[in-house]
A protein has these predicted regions:
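Flavin-dependent oxidoreductase catalytic core characteristic
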Residues: 1-197
């Protein structure tokens, strides 16, 4: 739809990929929205409180995962497979926690203003897209039976996509409007600095 309506894909990047994806795939956001529009006010308040505290707990757990994964260069994360691509699975998991943490902080702190800050949501969409593409590279390699001739291409693709995810996440933090919160996120997401080159 976004490509047909607009050629630059700005709407697709900022609202469709991140905006709808954040609502539909998040374990708490849709519950919060449904609770807020519940006609039974008392039940809605109870449901909203439960969802909000679940959301906050989810955000804190992702912050902790992101920090410790970054400090250990993703070595504390268990990969689903062993072999030459194991480290890429670990790094994708690290960026997944970092992305979820950054997206939650943005949603909780900016609320509806995040829609107006299209460049922020577009950068988060780019992080999500890079992680998705890296996952597909690894899945294809596994589905093909791990052909040795493909390994250099897999490594190149994963390194490039992880680098792009890092750069977009860093760009998101540089442009986040609440500067003290951006600094806190930077410490938790990139405590060792930018490690992919």
């Amino acid at each position: 739809v976004g490509i047909t309506v607009e050629g630059a894909n700005i709407l697709t990047r900022s609202l469709i990929i991140f905006g709808q994806g954040a609502v539909r795939c998040h374990p708490w956001v849709l519950k919060e929205m449904n609770a807020a529009k519940n006609p039974d006010h008392q039940q809605g308040v109870r449901d909203f409180d439960a969802a909000l505290f679940g959301h906050i707990g989810f955000t804190i757990s992702n912050a902790v995962r992101s920090f410790f994964a970054a400090i250990t260069l993703s070595r504390i994360i268990k990969a689903p497979i062993k072999g030459p691509t194991m480290r890429y699975f670990e790094h994708i998991n690290r960026f997944s926690a970092s992305f979820a943490f950054a997206a939650d902080v943005a949603m909780l702190s900016l609320g509806g203003y995040l829609k107006k800050k299209e460049s922020l949501s577009a950068r988060l969409a780019d992080v999500l897209s890079s992680m998705y593409l890296a996952s597909m590279v690894l899945k294809h390699y596994e589905n093909q039976g791990r052909p040795p001739a493909d390994l250099p291409l897999v490594e190149y693709g994963c390194r490039l996509l992880l680098y792009q995810a890092q750069e977009q996440l860093h760009s998101f933090l540089r442009n986040f409007p609440i500067r003290w919160l951006a600094g806190l996120m930077r410490v938790l997401i990139f405590p060792r600095g930018l490690t992919y080159s």
